[in-house]
From Swiss-Prot:
Name listed for the protein in its UniProt record: Energy-coupling factor transporter ATP-binding protein EcfA1
Residues bound to ATP: 38-45
Purpose of the protein: ATP-binding (A) component of a common energy-coupling factor (ECF) ABC-transporter complex. Unlike classic ABC transporters this ECF transporter provides the energy necessary to transport a number of different substrates.
Species this chain originates from: Oenococcus oeni (strain ATCC BAA-331 / PSU-1)
Subcellular compartments: Cell membrane
Length: 277
Protein backbone atom coordinates (compact mmCIF):
# COMPACT_ATOMS: atom_id res chain seq x y z
CA UNK A 1 0.00 0.00 0.00
CA UNK A 2 1.29 3.47 -0.89
CA UNK A 3 1.73 5.74 2.12
CA UNK A 4 3.30 8.63 0.16
CA UNK A 5 2.66 9.67 -3.42
CA UNK A 6 3.54 12.79 -5.39
CA UNK A 7 2.04 13.69 -8.76
CA UNK A 8 3.61 16.25 -11.11
CA UNK A 9 5.07 18.22 -8.19
CA UNK A 10 6.58 21.65 -8.94
CA UNK A 11 8.07 24.33 -6.69
CA UNK A 12 10.08 27.53 -7.15
CA UNK A 13 11.37 29.81 -4.42
CA UNK A 14 10.00 33.36 -4.45
CA UNK A 15 11.36 35.59 -7.23
CA UNK A 16 13.19 32.68 -8.85
CA UNK A 17 12.44 31.59 -12.38
CA UNK A 18 14.29 28.30 -11.81
CA UNK A 19 12.27 25.44 -10.40
CA UNK A 20 13.75 23.83 -7.29
CA UNK A 21 11.42 20.87 -7.81
CA UNK A 22 10.22 20.05 -11.31
CA UNK A 23 7.58 17.51 -12.31
CA UNK A 24 8.48 15.09 -9.51
CA UNK A 25 6.52 11.83 -9.41
CA UNK A 26 7.27 9.03 -6.96
CA UNK A 27 5.61 6.84 -4.35
CA UNK A 28 6.66 5.14 -1.12
CA UNK A 29 5.17 1.93 0.22
CA UNK A 30 4.07 1.55 3.82
CA UNK A 31 7.09 0.34 5.85
CA UNK A 32 9.62 1.10 3.10
CA UNK A 33 12.95 2.90 3.64
CA UNK A 34 13.77 5.39 0.90
CA UNK A 35 16.93 7.47 0.72
CA UNK A 36 16.98 10.68 -1.31
CA UNK A 37 20.46 11.54 -2.61
CA UNK A 38 21.95 14.21 -4.84
CA UNK A 39 24.57 16.92 -4.86
CA UNK A 40 24.10 20.21 -2.99
CA UNK A 41 21.27 22.26 -4.46
CA UNK A 42 19.59 19.28 -6.12
CA UNK A 43 16.33 19.82 -4.22
CA UNK A 44 16.54 17.15 -1.50
CA UNK A 45 15.60 19.27 1.50
CA UNK A 46 13.06 21.26 -0.52
CA UNK A 47 11.27 18.03 -1.41
CA UNK A 48 10.87 16.82 2.17
CA UNK A 49 9.64 20.25 3.28
CA UNK A 50 6.98 20.01 0.59
CA UNK A 51 5.94 16.58 1.87
CA UNK A 52 5.35 17.95 5.38
CA UNK A 53 3.66 21.15 4.21
CA UNK A 54 6.49 23.38 5.45
CA UNK A 55 6.55 24.65 1.86
CA UNK A 56 3.55 24.93 -0.45
CA UNK A 57 3.90 23.47 -3.94
CA UNK A 58 3.24 25.70 -6.95
CA UNK A 59 1.40 22.83 -8.62
CA UNK A 60 0.93 19.09 -8.38
CA UNK A 61 -0.43 16.82 -5.70
CA UNK A 62 0.95 15.23 -2.50
CA UNK A 63 -0.94 12.31 -0.94
CA UNK A 64 0.03 11.13 2.56
CA UNK A 65 -1.61 7.99 3.96
CA UNK A 66 -4.68 8.54 1.79
CA UNK A 67 -5.00 12.29 2.49
CA UNK A 68 -4.32 14.88 -0.20
CA UNK A 69 -2.20 17.68 1.29
CA UNK A 70 -4.13 20.95 1.58
CA UNK A 71 -4.72 23.69 4.14
CA UNK A 72 -7.64 21.63 5.44
CA UNK A 73 -5.62 18.42 5.93
CA UNK A 74 -2.27 20.00 6.90
CA UNK A 75 -2.36 19.33 10.64
CA UNK A 76 -3.79 15.85 10.24
CA UNK A 77 -0.93 15.02 7.87
CA UNK A 78 1.68 16.52 10.20
CA UNK A 79 0.52 14.11 12.91
CA UNK A 80 1.58 11.31 10.59
CA UNK A 81 5.07 12.70 9.86
CA UNK A 82 8.03 13.31 12.15
CA UNK A 83 11.15 15.12 10.93
CA UNK A 84 14.65 15.02 12.45
CA UNK A 85 16.90 17.75 11.08
CA UNK A 86 20.65 18.01 10.63
CA UNK A 87 21.61 19.93 13.76
CA UNK A 88 20.03 18.55 16.95
CA UNK A 89 21.01 21.66 18.94
CA UNK A 90 18.50 23.68 16.92
CA UNK A 91 15.70 21.42 18.15
CA UNK A 92 16.27 21.75 21.91
CA UNK A 93 14.20 24.32 23.79
CA UNK A 94 13.99 22.98 27.37
CA UNK A 95 16.32 22.50 30.31
CA UNK A 96 16.05 18.72 30.58
CA UNK A 97 15.88 15.86 28.12
CA UNK A 98 12.42 14.66 29.16
CA UNK A 99 10.95 18.18 29.09
CA UNK A 100 12.31 18.62 25.60
CA UNK A 101 10.78 15.36 24.37
CA UNK A 102 7.43 16.36 25.91
CA UNK A 103 7.54 19.89 24.46
CA UNK A 104 6.86 18.76 20.90
CA UNK A 105 3.53 17.23 21.94
CA UNK A 106 2.05 20.51 23.19
CA UNK A 107 0.97 21.52 19.68
CA UNK A 108 -1.10 18.34 19.41
CA UNK A 109 -3.28 18.98 22.48
CA UNK A 110 -2.12 15.81 24.19
CA UNK A 111 -3.07 15.67 27.92
CA UNK A 112 -0.20 16.43 30.34
CA UNK A 113 -0.25 12.98 31.96
CA UNK A 114 -0.14 11.24 28.58
CA UNK A 115 2.69 13.51 27.42
CA UNK A 116 4.87 12.31 30.30
CA UNK A 117 4.08 8.64 29.62
CA UNK A 118 4.83 9.04 25.90
CA UNK A 119 8.06 10.95 26.60
CA UNK A 120 9.31 8.24 28.97
CA UNK A 121 8.40 5.47 26.52
CA UNK A 122 10.10 7.26 23.61
CA UNK A 123 13.29 7.74 25.64
CA UNK A 124 13.25 4.05 26.60
CA UNK A 125 12.82 3.11 22.95
CA UNK A 126 15.95 5.02 21.87
CA UNK A 127 17.94 3.95 24.94
CA UNK A 128 18.06 7.40 26.59
CA UNK A 129 15.76 7.02 29.62
CA UNK A 130 18.75 7.19 32.01
CA UNK A 131 19.44 10.71 30.72
CA UNK A 132 15.86 11.97 31.20
CA UNK A 133 16.72 14.60 33.82
CA UNK A 134 20.01 15.72 32.29
CA UNK A 135 20.48 18.89 30.28
CA UNK A 136 20.66 18.30 26.50
CA UNK A 137 23.86 20.39 26.32
CA UNK A 138 25.69 17.68 28.29
CA UNK A 139 25.00 14.99 25.70
CA UNK A 140 27.22 13.76 22.87
CA UNK A 141 26.19 14.39 19.26
CA UNK A 142 24.83 10.88 18.84
CA UNK A 143 22.91 11.10 22.12
CA UNK A 144 21.39 14.45 21.10
CA UNK A 145 20.11 12.99 17.85
CA UNK A 146 18.63 10.02 19.71
CA UNK A 147 16.77 12.49 21.94
CA UNK A 148 15.61 14.37 18.84
CA UNK A 149 14.35 11.06 17.43
CA UNK A 150 12.57 10.37 20.74
CA UNK A 151 10.82 13.74 20.47
CA UNK A 152 9.51 12.73 17.07
CA UNK A 153 8.51 9.21 18.18
CA UNK A 154 6.48 10.63 21.08
CA UNK A 155 4.08 12.10 18.51
CA UNK A 156 3.64 8.53 17.21
CA UNK A 157 4.12 9.22 13.49
CA UNK A 158 3.74 6.65 10.73
CA UNK A 159 6.48 8.30 8.66
CA UNK A 160 9.94 9.32 9.89
CA UNK A 161 11.94 11.79 7.79
CA UNK A 162 15.66 12.29 8.46
CA UNK A 163 17.15 15.38 6.82
CA UNK A 164 20.92 14.76 6.88
CA UNK A 165 20.29 13.69 10.49
CA UNK A 166 23.72 12.09 10.99
CA UNK A 167 25.91 14.26 8.76
CA UNK A 168 27.37 16.39 11.58
CA UNK A 169 28.28 13.41 13.76
CA UNK A 170 31.49 11.41 14.08
CA UNK A 171 31.49 7.80 12.76
CA UNK A 172 30.43 6.34 16.11
CA UNK A 173 27.62 8.88 16.44
CA UNK A 174 26.39 8.18 12.90
CA UNK A 175 26.36 4.44 13.50
CA UNK A 176 24.50 5.01 16.78
CA UNK A 177 21.76 6.97 14.98
CA UNK A 178 21.37 4.56 12.03
CA UNK A 179 21.21 1.48 14.25
CA UNK A 180 18.54 3.21 16.35
CA UNK A 181 16.49 3.98 13.24
CA UNK A 182 16.90 0.42 11.95
CA UNK A 183 15.61 -1.00 15.24
CA UNK A 184 12.66 1.40 15.33
CA UNK A 185 11.69 0.65 11.75
CA UNK A 186 11.62 -3.07 12.47
CA UNK A 187 9.75 -2.72 15.77
CA UNK A 188 7.15 -0.16 14.69
CA UNK A 189 6.96 -0.74 10.92
CA UNK A 190 7.86 2.91 10.34
CA UNK A 191 8.15 4.29 6.85
CA UNK A 192 11.53 6.04 6.66
CA UNK A 193 12.74 8.72 4.27
CA UNK A 194 16.35 9.75 4.78
CA UNK A 195 18.07 12.58 2.96
CA UNK A 196 21.77 11.92 2.51
CA UNK A 197 24.73 12.98 0.41
CA UNK A 198 27.00 10.18 1.66
CA UNK A 199 26.58 7.01 -0.40
CA UNK A 200 28.37 5.06 2.34
CA UNK A 201 25.16 5.25 4.39
CA UNK A 202 22.67 3.76 1.92
CA UNK A 203 22.92 0.13 2.99
CA UNK A 204 19.78 0.17 5.13
CA UNK A 205 17.63 1.58 2.32
CA UNK A 206 15.18 -0.42 0.23
CA UNK A 207 15.36 2.11 -2.59
CA UNK A 208 17.23 5.24 -3.65
CA UNK A 209 15.85 8.35 -5.34
CA UNK A 210 18.50 10.48 -7.03
CA UNK A 211 17.68 14.16 -7.58
CA UNK A 212 19.46 16.44 -10.04
CA UNK A 213 18.40 20.09 -10.45
CA UNK A 214 15.04 19.35 -8.89
CA UNK A 215 14.25 16.41 -11.17
CA UNK A 216 14.34 12.67 -10.48
CA UNK A 217 17.40 11.34 -12.28
CA UNK A 218 16.93 7.79 -10.97
CA UNK A 219 14.55 5.78 -8.77
CA UNK A 220 16.32 2.49 -8.25
CA UNK A 221 17.82 -0.17 -6.00
CA UNK A 222 21.15 0.51 -4.31
CA UNK A 223 23.23 -1.96 -6.32
CA UNK A 224 21.80 -0.69 -9.60
CA UNK A 225 22.82 2.84 -8.66
CA UNK A 226 26.32 1.71 -7.69
CA UNK A 227 26.77 -0.18 -10.96
CA UNK A 228 25.95 2.88 -13.12
CA UNK A 229 29.28 4.73 -13.14
CA UNK A 230 28.09 7.21 -15.77
CA UNK A 231 25.08 8.23 -13.68
CA UNK A 232 27.24 8.63 -10.57
CA UNK A 233 29.75 10.76 -12.46
CA UNK A 234 27.06 13.04 -13.92
CA UNK A 235 25.75 13.70 -10.42
CA UNK A 236 29.15 14.22 -8.74
CA UNK A 237 28.70 11.10 -6.62
CA UNK A 238 31.49 8.73 -5.65
CA UNK A 239 31.24 5.01 -5.03
CA UNK A 240 31.31 4.11 -1.32
CA UNK A 241 34.57 2.54 -0.12
CA UNK A 242 33.11 -0.98 -0.01
CA UNK A 243 31.81 -0.84 -3.58
CA UNK A 244 34.99 0.79 -4.89
CA UNK A 245 37.04 -1.95 -3.23
CA UNK A 246 34.94 -4.66 -4.90
CA UNK A 247 35.32 -2.90 -8.25
CA UNK A 248 39.10 -2.79 -7.82
CA UNK A 249 39.21 -6.45 -6.76
CA UNK A 250 37.19 -7.48 -9.82
CA UNK A 251 39.62 -5.64 -12.05
CA UNK A 252 42.46 -7.53 -10.36
CA UNK A 253 40.84 -10.87 -11.26
CA UNK A 254 38.67 -11.79 -8.27
CA UNK A 255 35.22 -12.98 -9.32
CA UNK A 256 32.22 -12.00 -7.22
CA UNK A 257 28.93 -13.90 -7.37
CA UNK A 258 27.09 -10.93 -5.87
CA UNK A 259 27.53 -7.35 -4.68
CA UNK A 260 28.26 -7.03 -0.96
CA UNK A 261 26.81 -4.05 0.91
CA UNK A 262 28.18 -4.95 4.33
CA UNK A 263 31.83 -5.14 5.32
CA UNK A 264 31.48 -8.35 7.32
CA UNK A 265 29.90 -10.17 4.36
CA UNK A 266 32.72 -9.07 2.06
CA UNK A 267 35.39 -10.12 4.58
CA UNK A 268 33.77 -13.55 4.95
CA UNK A 269 33.65 -13.99 1.17
CA UNK A 270 37.31 -13.00 0.75
CA UNK A 271 38.39 -15.25 3.60
CA UNK A 272 36.61 -18.24 2.04
CA UNK A 273 38.12 -17.40 -1.36
CA UNK A 274 41.64 -17.22 0.04
CA UNK A 275 41.34 -20.30 2.27
CA UNK A 276 39.58 -22.33 -0.42
CA UNK A 277 36.69 -23.29 1.85
Amino acid sequence: MKIIETKNLNYSYTQSSIRSIENVNFSVLDGEWITIVGKNGSGKSTLIRLLDGLLKADSGKIIIDGLTLSEKTLWEIRKKIGIVFQNPDNQFVSGSVIEDVAFGMENYQIPQEEMLVRAQQALKTVGMIDFAEKSPVRLSGGQKQRVAIAGVLAIQPKILILDEAASMLDPDGRDEVWQTIKKLKEQQNLTVISVNHDLNELNLSDRVILLNDGKIAADTKINQLFSDSELLSKNDLKLPFLQQLQKDLRESGINFTQEYNHQRELVNFLWKSISGT
